[in-house]
Amino acid sequence: MASTTLSIATTIRSSSPLTSASTHHFLSKPTAIEFPFRLSSSSSHRAINLRPISAVEAPEKIEKIGSEISSLTLEEARILVDYLQDKFGVSPLSLAPAAAAVAAPADGGAAAVVEEQTEFDVVINEVPSSSRIAVIKAVRALTSLALKEAKELIEGLPKKFKEGITKDEAEEAKKTLEEAGAKVSIA
């Protein structure tokens, strides 16, 4: 078996063009080996751009507007939202009661729908200079704000402290801030 392995190794070595000592010097550059297979240029893999399947067929005008809006940056989108709110005289908070009124059952218009407010905003109106540190500590205890952000919050009042919270949370936040010395209101 040893003689068979030796003869196979000798055959491979002698048939290899790179190991022939008579034709190549050890410092010479070896020749490049090319693989026998090549991809033809006609069999390239190309991505096919398919149009997404949509549930609603939109007119060309709507598709154009949608593509323009989707190409906006975040800053441009924010400016667009502000512009449309100013143009139509709406705010995000004014849309929630309107949606609830639309969803309410119609009783022929005879009964007036009385909406009970479910979301409240806590507004810090004033902070006396003698109680600024205590109010900053209370703000940090009620939120996850850092010291710098809490300090900036109580400057340039009135400012909304918390938005869209329940009545119980609003009452508790108001109580805590008033104990610290701030003048607070719930809207």
Swiss-Prot record:
Major subcellular site: plastid
Protein name according to UniProt: Large ribosomal subunit protein bL12cx
Source species: Arabidopsis thaliana
InterPro entries cross-referenced by the UniProt entry: Ribosomal_bL12, Ribosomal_bL12_C, Ribosomal_bL12_C/ClpS-like, Ribosomal_bL12_oligo, Ribosomal_bL12_oligo_N_sf
Family: Belongs to the bacterial ribosomal protein bL12 family.
Sample GO molecular function, one term: structural constituent of ribosome
Keywords of the record: Chloroplast, Plastid, Ribonucleoprotein, Ribosomal protein, Transit peptide
Signal sequence region: none
A biological process from GO: translation
Alphabetical list of Pfam families matching this protein: Ribosomal_L12, Ribosomal_L12_N
Annotated organelle transit peptide span: 1-54
GO cellular component, one term: thylakoid
